[in-house]
Amino acid sequence: AKKVANLNSSGDRPNMMAGNISNSNIWNDKDKATHLEVEKMFTEMVGWAVDEGADMLIGETFYYAEEAYKALEVMQKTGLPSVITIAPMAENIMRDGVGIVDTCKELEQRGGQVVGMNCFRGPPTMLPYIKEIRNALKCHIAALPITYRTTEKNPTFFNLPDNNGCGCPTPHQTTFPTALDPMQVNRYEMGKFMKECFDLGINYLGVCCGANPMLIRETAHAVGLTVPASKYKEKMSNHFMYGTNKRIPKHMKDYGDK
């Protein structure tokens, strides 16, 4: 990762390599022994990142508030800039009972330089909380949604139903994780989310589970950037039925509404 970051890295926006830690999936708010085990894991992983020359550290996808606090504590000991993002489950509260916005407030108070949300939620169910977090905090805010159409009834992708006429149901009990394809947002939905966030002053933006180059490109365009992949953006003027290019025969255009 460091070698890739150093490729063509110059100017006022150099590439950065980030070290990463995330939810341990063993943290138990009622079992202090797991807290010590997780701290050891975080310390070891952060140490590896520092040894390899990380420019910054990211802690992400935490659904226990206290685990997020511990991750931030470990990262801050390095002196590197720290990003910390949470991923509350469908109950719309952290699993140890702390509110979503309150968790973010506490992370800011503890020194988080970028605080926000990532994963589990698509644009429709992440944006309302991102707006609240932006209003409540002064630090930089992060927003990295998944790429699926989550709803108020199903705010995360773990129990998202397929109501699109699926003829071959998933062998699992849920569409997660291997049958979410029909619920994916399109490029315009993702671009709209990113533009709304950027207009709110949120400048740490990305795409989480389900990300693809097209959606990353739309994110870049939403904040006014032109990137190498911009040349692949659709050019509908050349479409054989829906285009406006004078070379397109009229009888082909007429067929577009058939």
Residue map of PLM features:
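Domain-level signal for soluble alpha/beta catalytic cores
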Residues: 2-258
